[in-house]
Design a protein with these regions (language model features):
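N-terminal secretory signal peptides that target proteins for export/translocation
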Residues: 1-12
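Bacterial N-terminal signal peptides
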Residues: 16-29
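Active-site histidine-anchored catalytic micro-motif
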Residues: 35-36, 48, 60-66, 76-83, ...
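A residue-level signal for conserved active-site and pocket-lining positions in enzyme catalytic cores
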Residues: 42, 171, 287
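Short, solvent-exposed amphipathic alpha-helices that sit
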Residues: 49-57
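Anionic-ligand-binding alpha/beta catalytic cores of soluble enzymes and soluble regulatory domains
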Residues: 156-238
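A conserved acidic, glycine/proline-rich C-terminal tail/linker
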Residues: 224-295
Length: 309
């Protein structure tokens, strides 16, 4: 008779007398799966902070595969750290471990956690709002608080301002290298994280509203969180004009029209356009120019947009 052992990952093998499902996770513990460790921070690359984190990780296991999202998060900008995670993490393989360090509260009572998402990705970070968008998009399977007695770099207890190196890189490396299981991170917490409030996308009375979470920095395009399904409720056709209003809090920053296009080359240089970016979210741009610089439109949890015919 076949016997099943229930966990989050299984393989099936044939044995004499039937089929047995064996958990890939020893004794129901959860291991990261692929030795991949991905970093992001607001440290910049002008000094040795990022290299120190990677050195700690390689000291845990030289077999780790280390990658970066970015280390150019503006200093203390937790919202942008949250967005860069959700922009990139869904494209990484299941089992990937991410270390995100944008930590203006370093050394205080804020919790250090590892989030396991329903997609099977791990996020090692301070619980300060960094997980806002990841938790919404990928879902929360479990949250654990890092036990710094067991999961902290040796002889680092006198350091209070570099948890990126001493706690997050160290713990992330141990998890990614299967030195520890997810359950060995620390105590299980309620399935919730600190969340930054923002305007959720919505449609009402012939208008679509959303947030401007980020800029396409290199080109000055303005990215929103309005997807095609929501936008299509406006019944705007390709080539039509879109009425746009942009606010920062209660202050109106921009009001005007843009042409709805698939891509920039459909209009002359300098023409304002509305299009869908590579994440299939509505965006504002100027052919061969910066919409952000032209109209002083920026991004963050307080920036929101209204679209209409």
């Amino acid at each position: 008779m076949a016997t099943s052992f229930y966990s989050s990952s299984f393989k099936r093998i044939k044995v004499s007398g039937g089929v047995v499902f064996l958990s890939l996770l020893t004794f129901f513990n959860t291991f990261a799966q692929n030795n991949i460790l991905v970093f992001q921070s607001d440290f910049g690359l002008k000094d040795g902070a990022v290299s120190a984190m990677k050195g700690v990780a390689m000291g845990v296991s030289p077999d780790l595969k280390l990658f970066d999202i970015t280390h150019e998060i503006p200093a203390y900008n937790i919202w942008e750290a949250a967005y860069r995670l959700v922009q990139t993490a869904p494209y990484w393989p299941t089992g990937t471990v991410f270390v995100s360090v944008c930590d203006p509260g370093v050394g205080t009572e804020r919790k250090s956690v590892v989030l396991l998402t329903k997609s099977g990705h791990y996020f090692v970070t301070p619980d300060n709002g960094t997980l806002t968008l990841i938790a919404e998009q990928l879902g929360i399977r479990e949250v654990r608080e890092i036990d710094e007695v067991r999961n902290r770099r040796r002889n680092s207890n006198e350091s209070y301002t570099f948890h990126g190196r001493d706690v997050y890189a160290f713990t992330g490396a141990r998890l990614a290298s299967k030195t520890i299981t997810y359950e060995q991170i620390g105590q299980k917490l309620p399935n919730q994280v600190v969340s930054i409030p923002y305007q959720k996308p919505s449609f009402a009375q012939g208008r679509v509203q959303g947030t401007i979470p980020i800029l396409d920095i290199q080109y000055g395009n303005v990215w929103t969180d309005i997807d095609k399904k929501l936008f299509n409720q406006l019944e705007i056709k390709m080539g039509d004009a879109i009425q746009v209003q942009v606010f920062n809090g209660n202050d109106k920053i921009y009001e005007g029209t843009v042409k709805y296009v698939n891509t920039f080359g459909e209009v002359k240089e300098g023409v304002d356009v509305g299009y869908f970016n590579s994440l299939l979210n509505f965006s504002l741009g100027v052919n061969m120019n910066s919409f952000s610089a032209k109209y002083k439109v920026f991004s963050g949890s307080t920036w929101h947009i209204i679209l209409s015919k």
